[in-house]
Amino acid sequence: MSVVLENDLARLVLSESGCAESLILRSTGEECLSPAEPVPFFSVTQDRPFNNEVKLAHPNKRTVYPANRIRMEKTASGARLTVGFDLAPYEAVVDVTVAPRYFAFSLADWIVPDSAYPGLAMNTPPAAEFRLIALSVPHRAHFGAWLNVSWDEGAAVCVLAADPTPRIDSEPFRDRRLLTADAVREIRLKGSAAALICAPSAAFLDAVDDLERDYDLPRGVESRRSAAINASAYWTADCTPENVDEHIRYAKAGGFRMMLLYYTCLFRERGGYALNGNYDWRDEYPDKREDARRMLEKIHAAGITPGLHFLHTHIGLDSRYCTPDADPRLHKVRRFTLARPLCEGDTVIEVEEDPEGCASDPRCRILQFGGELVSYESFTTERPYRFTGCVRGLRGTTVRSHPRGEIGGLLDVSEFGASSCYLDQETSLQDEIADKIAEAYSAGFRFCYFDGSEGAIAPFEYHIPMAQYRVWHKLTPSPLYTEGAAKAHFSWHHLSGGNAFDVFPPAVFKEMIRRYPDEEAPRMRRISRGSTSAGGASGSPKDGTTAGHRPISSSSGPAAPPPGTAPSRSRRISPPSAAIRAWATFSRSSAAGRTSAPAGF
């Protein structure tokens, strides 16, 4: 018997064999599934077969086992589905929430009979991934890659995450697009949840808003509908209690309602980002946060809303996290095991693993063993594997002896100037840095910019938004909006200001606006047949607004330094025209009549 799930907006039918059979928009009766061959709604992926008989009969490789049967029992919140698969000798239990304007699917449990893996000492089932949703939909006029929504003037169909853990994606075909949501073992299988929205286009953002409120997500819809999202921002890297009045004067002269303060306004820095992570207050703040609070009160009193610009994943190579003892929570892109003891005077490091592909840029050739940082000149790619020409005690770290078998690694040095490295988001260091940022933010900031967001660990589609979210979650009060240097699916909920094209100096600013964000905006509107729309702007098709670039922002301080260079420490207040900085994002307003993209998908 088919499984029928119905809410106020749509009716979803899954066949008894596990395929999506129909998705009807109730207001019009439109069928929203592709007429192509049905696709299994659920599936499970294993790295190889583990059941002995399946392993012997089939190739040992990463394999997808599609659903081949479903049975349903109703629950107070919707339904509980028990799903079986081709060949895989177990079943999945999926909880379905039927909300008025969305359906949510969460992996609740597994049913593994004793006969499935007899005598094997292993965790069962050996699932690497579980597909929560697979939906084949026909192409529509627009596709928003960021939120994973296909829409036109009449209807919108979207598969999106209900928490930070699922991998959300799509695959375009000639006549259709496959929307998918997957729970991943290394992040979370049980409890991972994704949602399906099928709605009239005019009601789509309302449905997303319901999901955000029900699952206590950042309020992306509410933020995109606020007046603040459309305001220009005045940016400065050198606003302090001593010169804040001049900055306010320039901002008011330019008509700016928002002022974005780079973290160097508050904290000591040198050599690019070399001290990032310390968050030591500048001398101009003897009372630290209290001095910042009084300065921000002045900005608020002038009718300007202050925001904080920071790099939340960067750790400066001269910070206390790197020297004199490098923190074990710094991210290593490769791991190496010492094949011989490393004594204090040694300049050759012998390891068990092949260093092929290790960093060749001289600024990035840094190994970490224990608390010591070591640079190298070269390495061998045949046994014995060796790093040669090593300089011990780099960046003032303590030179030590290291025993055979000690595991170290290649430090994840930031590509932006190599004055910092990236922290490991799987450790407590991300939360430790978030606490420092939140303490400063609480002095009176109301929005923020997640700079350096691309500096995360793989899988990037999870860790880029999750690193932002771990900071966002600690900020009080919640930001009116945020911007970032990178985004992925879950960022949509908190990164309502989008991405900033933020490295261009004044002399080329207008040219770069035309080359990048101005080119991006109309591309967001194209029918994406067989191609992926970049980034993520699109939005409510019938809300009466369009989106373009946020108007050009100016600052009275020096222009933002290119990544990896030191912010200017000059106390001189330059005219605004000498320090224009781009904040090109997609928001809910059109930019001076330019071709624009819809707001916010």
Question: How does the language model describe each region?
Answer:
Residues 1-224, 549-550:
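N-terminal accessory beta-strand-rich subdomains and adjacent acidic, glycine-rich linkers
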Residues 14-17, 468-601:
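Active-site-proximal substrate-binding groove within the catalytic cores of carbohydrate-active enzymes
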Residues 85-87, 98-100, 109-111, 265, ...:
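Short, flexible loop/turn elements at secondary-structure junctions
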Residues 211-240, 359, 364-368, 384, ...:
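Mobile, glycine- and charge-enriched loop segments
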Residues 226-335, 412-438, 443-458, 462-466:
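Aromatic-lined carbohydrate-binding/catalytic grooves of carbohydrate-active enzymes
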Residues 266-271, 313-318, 375, 397, ...:
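Flexible loop/turn segments at secondary-structure boundaries
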Residues 292-316, 321, 329-337, 343-345, ...:
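Carbohydrate-binding surfaces of carbohydrate-active enzymes
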Residues 312-399:
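Autoprocessing Asn-cyclization modules and mimics
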